[in-house]
Amino acid sequence: MSKSKKRKGDEGESIASNFLISLDHEILKRNYRFLHCEIDIISVKEEVLYFSEVKFWKEFKFFDPRFTFNLAKQTKMRKAAKGFLAENLSFQNHFVSFCLVSVNEKKGCKYYLDLF
C-alpha cells in the first residue's frame, strides 16, 4: 500500500472515529487484525458491538457505498469479529452489528448499520 493511500485511509478512519464518538460510541480498537482479516473500527454503545468498515471518498461518488461489501469482505469481517470475541470474552453477550461508515470530504459521514 502506498504511503498516500495509507495516509488517506488513516484520515478517513480518524474522521469516522470522531463521528462514532459523537454518536456516543466508545472506540475499542482501530485497525484490528486477526489472521489475514482486518476491521477498521470496533466500537461499543450500550449492549451492541459495532464492527465498522470505513470508506473515504475525496470526491462525491454517484453510487451506493454499501456495494463495496462483497461476499469476500463479509467473510473476512466475520472471521475477524470471531477472533475479537474469542480474545475479549467480556463482549460475548453483546449484540453484533456489521457496519459501514462512508466518509466524504465534502458531504460528511453516513452510517450504514446491520449490513449483513
Curated annotation (Swiss-Prot):
On the tree of life, the source organism's domain of life is Bacteria
Q: Which Gene3D superfamilies match?
A: 3.40.1350.10
Checking InterPro entries in the record gives:
Restrct_endonuc-II-like, tRNA_endonuc-like_dom_sf, UPF0102_YraN-like
Query: Which cysteines bridge via disulfide bonds?
Result: none
MF-aspect GO terms:
nucleic acid binding
Which NCBIfam families does the UniProt record give?
PRK12497.4-3
Q: Which family does it belong to?
A: Belongs to the UPF0102 family.
Which named protein is this?
Answer: UPF0102 protein LIC_11564
Natural source organism: Leptospira interrogans serogroup Icterohaemorrhagiae serovar copenhageni (strain Fiocruz L1-130)
Q: What is the lineage of its organism?
A: Bacteria, Pseudomonadati, Spirochaetota, Spirochaetia, Leptospirales
